[in-house]
Amino acid sequence: MAKKSLIQREKKRQKLEQKYHLIRQSLKKKIRSKVSPLSLSEKTKMREKLQSLPRNSAPTRLHRRCFLTGRPRANYRDFGLSGHVLREMVYECLLPGATRSSW
C-alpha cells in the first residue's frame, strides 16, 4: 500500500491539471498557430504565461496509480489496477470476463 500522502498528492495534481487544462491548451494553440502568425515578442509573452502556470498542472506530472493500493507501477489501463492486484482478482473471479490462461 502506498503512503496516503503520495495518493493525496496525485489527487491534487489531477485537480490542478483539470483546472488549468483549457488555459494551457489555448496558450499552446496560440503559440503554434500558423494561421495568424505571432511576432517573436508575442510568442515569448505567451510562453511566459505558460511557464507561470503551476508545475503540477502539467499533464506529464500525472502518474497512473492502482485505485485499490495506490501502487504506481505495473498498472493496467483497462482495469485501473496494478498487476498483482489484477492477478489476485482474476484468481478469485472478481473481474467479469477475465480468465486465467492455461495450456
Curated annotation (Swiss-Prot):
SUPFAM superfamilies associated with the record: Glucocorticoid receptor-like (DNA-binding domain)
GO cellular component term of the entry, any: small ribosomal subunit
Locations listed in the record: Plastid, Chloroplast
Protein name: Small ribosomal subunit protein uS14c
Subunit relationships: Part of the 30S ribosomal subunit.
Primary location: plastid
Superkingdom, natural source: Eukaryota
Family note: Belongs to the universal ribosomal protein uS14 family.
Keywords: Chloroplast, Plastid, Ribonucleoprotein, Ribosomal protein, RNA-binding, rRNA-binding
Protein's job: Binds 16S rRNA, required for the assembly of 30S particles.
Region (Disordered): 34-56
Listed Pfam families: Ribosomal_S14
GO biological process entries: translation
Single GO molecular function: structural constituent of ribosome
